[in-house]
């Protein structure tokens, strides 16, 4: 297993995490076998947004004395009034459900402000006692960090700019990133993922990931497989379905991403997902899926790695990623981004201008110029 730090929290998360939703309604032996298989595979980051007591208790029981070995995202405002998943901003209801979660798990590592997708959602959290409750939970140590969940890049950016959150769970996959920000990606998913609205990588979504990386707000990912539609021959919006490895690699190569939450229902599901860890670069490569959309990406690095190997040993995708983040505000490059760049074994200033990378790039990126810009921006060269 590989591990990444979640933003500036100091928490190291397995790049393949576990979303608990698909364990809801399953018998305890199945939950136990699945959870333990995930732990044995090195999974140490779990999302428990489900409000039902039974699934919460089953997961906690399956963790047993290994609770201390994992970090849990628990959602403030997730309820099931009327036996239906629901969102609540009613404080007595919010407290009831979250304090039940605390009783079951003892503490929650990431207290997630649940489902902020609209201005109404934002106001219901940040202009009411809801946010005060979350801050008090952190002050008492009941939660260690404050995060939030969203599917809307515009609203997510607004939340991050409050300065109160340390991580974000966001829906990231190639199809979602091709929808303009004003298109509701969750609605598109529910309606079948039409490709008619695709318009190239949406700049607001790309800027959101870069903003998170620059501010040290870690990202965990939901909807990595698009509810299974991206890997389905019948439902894919692309000319051919993506593979699980391609979906995972796309999400994990976005700036700021620490972990993807996958919905395992069995030990076999866990074993299948872990194949990503030993997959070759060819098996992970998602660029063939773009096919006829390639013109929409002209000149834009998608961090695919086709440019490698570099004779100077430069990790070109990493340099481009840090450069894209720094370009958000070149006069105020975050120290953490500069430090990550400077920690690279080979830097942009070592570019030989041989042009081999540009010959291999499917998207016509001016890699040589990017290396020069990175050298100027980060190294003063």
Question: What are these regions, as identified by a protein language model?
Answer:
Residues 311-328, 359, 363-377:
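Iron-sulfur (Fe-S) cluster-binding segments and ferredoxin-like electron-carrier domains
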């Amino acid at each position: 297993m590989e591990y990444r730090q979640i933003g500036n929290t100091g928490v190291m998360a397995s790049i393949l995490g576990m979303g608990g939703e698909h364990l809801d309604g399953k018998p305890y032996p199945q939950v136990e076998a699945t959870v333990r298989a995930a732990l044995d595979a090195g999974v140490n980051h779990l999302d428990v947004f489900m409000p039902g007591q039974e699934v919460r208790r089953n997961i906690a029981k399956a963790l047993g004395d290994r609770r201390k070995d994992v970090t849990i995202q628990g959602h403030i405002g997730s309820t099931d009034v009327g036996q239906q998943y629901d969102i609540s901003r009613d404080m007595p209801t919010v407290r009831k459900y979250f304090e039940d979660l605390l009783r079951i798990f003892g503490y929650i590592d990431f207290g997630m402000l649940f489902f902020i997708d609209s201005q109404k959602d934002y106001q219901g959290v940040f202009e009411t006692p809801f946010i005060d409750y979350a801050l008090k939970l952190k002050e008492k140590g009941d939660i260690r960090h404050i995060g939030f969940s969203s599917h809307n890049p515009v609203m997510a950016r607004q939340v991050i700019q409050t300065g109160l959150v340390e991580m974000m769970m966001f829906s990231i996959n190639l199809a979602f990133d091709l929808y303009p920000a004003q298109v509701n990606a969750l609605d598109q998913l529910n309606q079948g993922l039409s490709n008619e609205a695709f318009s190239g990588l949406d700049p607001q979504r790309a800027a959101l990931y870069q903003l998170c990386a620059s501010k040290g707000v870690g990202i965990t990912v939901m909807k990595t497989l698009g509810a299974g539609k991206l890997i389905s021959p019948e439902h894919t919006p692309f000319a051919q379905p993506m593979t699980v490895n391609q979906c995972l690699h796309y999400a994990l190569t976005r700036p700021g991403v620490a972990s993807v939450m996958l919905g395992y229902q069995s030990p076999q599901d866990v074993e299948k997902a872990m194949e990503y860890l030993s997959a070759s670069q060819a098996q992970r490569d998602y660029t063939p899926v773009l096919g006829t959309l390639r013109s929409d990406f002209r000149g834009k690095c998608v961090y695919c790695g086709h440019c490698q190997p570099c004779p100077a040993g430069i990790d070109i995708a990493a340099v481009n990623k840090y450069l894209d983040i720094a370009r958000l505000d070149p006069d105020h490059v975050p120290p953490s981004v500069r430090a990550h760049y400077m920690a690279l074994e080979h830097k942009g200033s070592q570019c030989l201008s041989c042009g081999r990378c540009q010959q291999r790039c499917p998207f016509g990126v001016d890699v040589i110029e990017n290396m020069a810009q990175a050298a100027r921006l980060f190294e003063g060269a």
